[in-house]
Amino acid sequence: MEAVPEKKKKVAAALGTLKKKKVPAVPETLKKKRRNFAELKVKRLRKKFALKTLRKARRKLIYEKAKHYHKEYRQMYRTEIRMARMARKAGNFYVPAEPKLAFVIRIRGINGVSPKVRKVLQLLRLRQIFNGTFVKLNKASVNMLRIVEPYIAWGYPNLKSVNELIYKRGYGKINKKRIALTDNSLVARSLGKFGIICMEDLIHEIYTVGKRFKEANNFLWPFKLSSPRGGMKKKTTHFVEGGDAGNREDQINRLIRRMN
């Protein structure tokens, strides 16, 4: 019976020694490391939240812009229809406004051509066969197109053609490299300072030939189109004579469909 109190005494003594032992202090370097890690984590979370908020705001802005542009395009189309109806009702002909935008496709090589033609093709950025570019129409550009007319097919693209070309074949010139336009951020990074932050902005600027057309068009790499389905008829003959070269006005849209 005396063994039990003896056992209790031993346990009590062991507990006493444990209480007397001091817990080793956490080193200052470890404390500092933990504190820095906690601060870094807070900063990272704040940055992540700020970026998320910014992306959300930008997505909303892009959606609103796309909606506005869609309304604008529809209004332009309805105005054209209304004007044509009014003219027809009055027994007149409606003459639409002069086109401001052209799409130019190179259809021939330049073997044995004059240096002047070669230079104009370089200015139009048509360095390879089946390359295509947008051109703002004015007196100077029309004269350039006339010089190289036997080597190009050109006309007036509609909204659908501009849309499909940029979305399907669109590449941007970023740091002198040809980069596929797979994200709005690529457009915003290069053209954000001009108020062009998304693909819809880019399409609108090109189609309407806006104030920043030059910057938007120079950002776009020349389009590399496929050989037209069904082939070409006669490259050396003008379109009005049954060939492929020269101005085909709104019929360029059919050629774009065959090559896109």
From Swiss-Prot:
Matching CDD domains: Ribosomal_L7_archeal_euk
Residues bearing the modification Phosphotyrosine: Y151
Sequence repeats: 7-18, 19-30, 31-42, 43-54, 55-66
InterPro entries assigned: Ribo_uL30_ferredoxin-like_sf (IPR036919), Ribosomal_uL30 (IPR039699), Ribosomal_uL30_CS (IPR018038), Ribosomal_uL30_euk (IPR005998), Ribosomal_uL30_euk_arc (IPR035808), Ribosomal_uL30_ferredoxin-like (IPR016082), Ribosomal_uL30_N_euk (IPR012988)
A Gene Ontology cellular-component term: postsynaptic density
Modification type N6-acetyllysine: residues: K136
Chain residue ranges for the region called 5 X 12 AA tandem repeats: 7-66
Modified residues annotated as N6-succinyllysine in this record: K139
Keywords: Acetylation, Cytoplasm, Phosphoprotein, Repeat, Ribonucleoprotein, Ribosomal protein, RNA-binding
Regions that span the bilayer: none
Subcellular locations according to the entry: Cytoplasm
Gene Ontology terms for molecular function: 5S rRNA binding; DNA binding; identical protein binding; mRNA binding; RNA binding; structural constituent of ribosome
Family matches, as Pfam families: Ribosomal_L30 (PF00327), Ribosomal_L30_N (PF08079)
Any one GO BP annotation for this protein: liver regeneration
N-acetylmethionine modifications at: M1
Modification Phosphothreonine, positions: T29
Gene3D superfamilies with a match to the protein in the record: Ribosomal protein L30, ferredoxin-like fold domain
Function in brief: Component of the large ribosomal subunit. The ribosome is a large ribonucleoprotein complex responsible for the synthesis of proteins in the cell. Binds to G-rich structures in 28S rRNA and in mRNAs. Plays a regulatory role in the translation apparatus; inhibits cell-free translation of mRNAs.
Family membership noted in the UniProt record: Belongs to the universal ribosomal protein uL30 family.
Oligomeric and partner information: Component of the large ribosomal subunit. Homodimer. Interacts with DHX33.
Name listed for the protein in its UniProt record: Large ribosomal subunit protein uL30
